């Protein structure tokens, strides 16, 4: 049995239905768990110009199918759910430096989700980049400013690193 009760799904449906069409495009609602995706009408115009938008949108659908209530606001961040801001990164990075840059870019959000394909290789590269960025920020405790890092692997979001566990990796 799942954790999705009738009341939770109905509450989610009311939240989704309350979004005004002049501000939000209602992209998807999952009747089985109450997960949904809604995109700000202005984000749709800007986002079409960005690379990786298809992966970002499909990732939001995966998360909604896992019961997440996803709002995609105009501008930054890429998404808002679970009371936090999220930045999506496609894992087409060639080296550790490009991954570190992606992590620094994602610092505007509470969390980063790397959308990965080849699980072990890419996760190891992301871990190296995180370790490197922690090392660069360690002396002045600035590493605490780093966002928590997750990976989206085969339809599941998994924690990779978070501040509470500091120097240990979740995967």
List where the protein language model places each region.
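Acidic (E/D-rich), amphipathic helical modules within compact regulatory domains
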Residues: 74-77
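Metal-dependent nuclease catalytic core centered on acidic motifs
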Residues: 1-70, 91-171
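Conserved catalytic cores of phosphodiester-cleaving nucleases, focusing on short active-site segments
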Residues: 79, 84-92
